[in-house]
């Protein structure tokens, strides 16, 4: 399955729209829809059909899956066919009961048995009591045989001595067409059984009638009637094939939509899951939840807030661990900067594994310092034990680096237990951090510790309950802060033998590393020295399996809602990691999704009105009504076929009636006009634009569609009615019956065929897929009502004369001709008719078929509305997933630079994998608030320090808001360290200060290359002005101490599992020293930086040489400002937060 692991790419825009297109062959816009690797081949098993109607999916596995899906969809329609069969049995029972006699007993018994069998089959199918294999493969043929047997039984038993070529032809036509719209079989078997049924029915009727007529055989009349039957059957089969094709095409599109929607949702869900995992690897879950909740607030709600949102929480009784690499300077001198970063990356990745094992929350990585907390966010009683075990494991882990690198590196670990304020400050580049006096103590515990030992405070000692042997730490002798505060310290000697047992009892082994190795396993040590690959990426010799925290991140999270389905999409995404290579796996997932979708009863009574089936929600009904049905032109073409077959049948019955030819020509022309107007919207390139616009308007306007459909059926009905009324010219009344019936080729020879033509009109009506079932009911009532009116009134004597002649020819008991003009069931003895008069039986047949087709139309509309709701549901789910993905994306890109986040949202990264980029010319800035430490107190008036941090959050947030200015778009906030703000310029890859794709350095002048450094200097000045505005409004006197430098750095991420973006290099070290050795209220730079910035109009004051640790004497300057004429030559002026504009 193709995957796109980036952010909002353009090609996804179409997939989030409400109109999701799927293209099939013969679509006018084929090639526009997204079919990915799926194609539809114009070939199939039914070779008798035109090539464009033979659709087959490629690959074959998908076609097999579709056939299974299609047959499942037709399972309900199989029940419809059972209902049809039951109605036919009821018809036979009524017809026999009305004129009951002893010779009707057999026919009545067979019909009764058939009705019972139909009811049993209905119950078995409805309740799902039959195996699927039987229901889909055996039951359709059983039902076909049962219906065929019932038709022949009725034919043989009910018309035993008076057969005619028209007997049961109407029912045969009805069921042949029903096979195509209900049986869950492929098209070829349906065509075969339909042809077999029609051939056998025709042969049986022809032979039987010929034998009964014997010496009085009317060969031409029988031949014409047999040919009329054939054309009726051919029409039913042709329209049935078209209906099957239309249903197949509709279901294929629904199937492709389901597959592609599943694929899109899996892509989105997987990306959203990656974003969530990445986010939760940087932020604790409770903080991320609160951030997402606030991000979804309306702008009006945000504007009502007096202060910027601060996500800060108090956590008591936690253990804080600080660990620092001793001898890091010696180690850094032994390898290059890139090799050093790679080494740190592998070492800290190992520490992250240990942190997961010992329930630690890694807070930050500061250079070579690693610190974490246990008991946050979820409290643990054994937090102190876990932290000490973590410290011991870190000391042992660094020993392997010491052995392999032959250097004196070691770990100095300090642990303190107390209270912290945990959260994030500012509005950009969020990083979780903790603040409190106890954090400071923990930091000093590390600074006052001894290399290779774990140094703990008295508060931590009080939580241990004797699990470890300790000795006095005497931390005050090595750290003035500890001595000043009078903090007793201890050094862990070694864990007792019971420690392992204690750790097990405390659940440590429950979250051990997946490979089950102990923290000091030597199996992982080679990875710590395999860091000198020339391509700049580090790899471990072993594979990395699923991590505990990754499993935790995948737990149910109410802030990251997934579609509320039994088959959760994140489960699908997890199970189809390599779906592009494993088509079978994706098809299995699709099958599960389709099964679940079918099992969900989407259309319920509470959603739709019972009678009309319209949605109760008017807006939903409007959306459904404008759904475009592209097969409407095909439906009108079926009307043309029906009219053609109608004309052929009527011409065969009465070849001398000129009205037949006139109605056919006029009706066919009118129907062709309607068909062309409907096809114009489907094939816009083949028709004039005005006709296409008119056709499109018809398709999208409900009343116009209904009117167009009514016109088509009205034409069919009127053609039949006009022919029936015109035929009356041959009939001159009962007195001239002999002469009237002697006219060979008259429609009076067999008036039943005009009712069979009405059945074709009913079939044409249900083919109108663009109208609702209520409109179809209206049209079918028009057809049935017109036929019934003519049968019972205009053609009443015609049918009576037909019955009279038929019974007379076969010497059957009958009433006098004058008595036949009014059917009276009260007649007895030999005067009782052996059959129900044709005028009644034909009328009942037409109405019963109308009811059957109406029942089927309701089923089709229910299915159409269900598919519509599924489509809306899929769209809404994709929108929800996409919306959550957008919020996750916003959070992730607010924690990592976008190009870095893209990298980590790709395929799963190994823990030791290093992402890094080298930059030769960037600017680095550190800006601190030295006097904030004096401002911070944890007194109750300040809510334990939270209010002090709230004020710091306002300052940092205002600094962050400066970055929204286009002038500072090339400036990247790296992080905040306490009250120190770190930023860099020029670290955005492939983009220069003007926002265009960068070219080679040789193609740009020095002024162009260092414009970003000037922007960074402007940013530092804007920060000073912003702080001045804050001081004026809050009556404070905070001052910034800023240091800047320029040069080359290595930017990258340490720890693929918990990515920490940072920059390293001598440039960063010097910039940090410029800040720490600077003077409050000033921006200090070295001479090389001053020379470059001076060219941009910045003013400097020479400070002179100062001593910098590790660098010796450096000549420095204070940046005082910029000439007004040179201010922001390439951008607009900057509006400062909290700026008070003087308009006087």
Swiss-Prot record:
There is a cross-link at residue 465 (Glycyl lysine isopeptide (Lys-Gly) (interchain with G-Cter in SUMO3)). It is a multi-pass membrane protein. The keyword Thylakoid does not apply. The modification Phosphoserine is found at residues 525, 580, 1076. GO terms for cellular component: ciliary membrane; cilium; cytoplasm; Golgi apparatus; membrane; plasma membrane. Catalyzes the formation of the signaling molecule cAMP in response to G-protein signaling. Participates in signaling cascades triggered by odorant receptors via its function in cAMP biosynthesis: specifically activated by G alpha protein GNAL/G(olf) in olfactory epithelium. Required for normal sperm motility and normal male fertility. Plays a role in regulating insulin levels and body fat accumulation in response to a high fat diet. Belongs to the adenylyl cyclase class-4/guanylyl cyclase family. The protein contains two modules with six transmembrane helices each; both are required for catalytic activity. Isolated N-terminal or C-terminal modules have no catalytic activity, but when they are brought together, enzyme activity is restored. The active site is at the interface of the two modules. This is Adenylate cyclase type 3. It comes from Homo sapiens (Human). The gene is ADCY3.
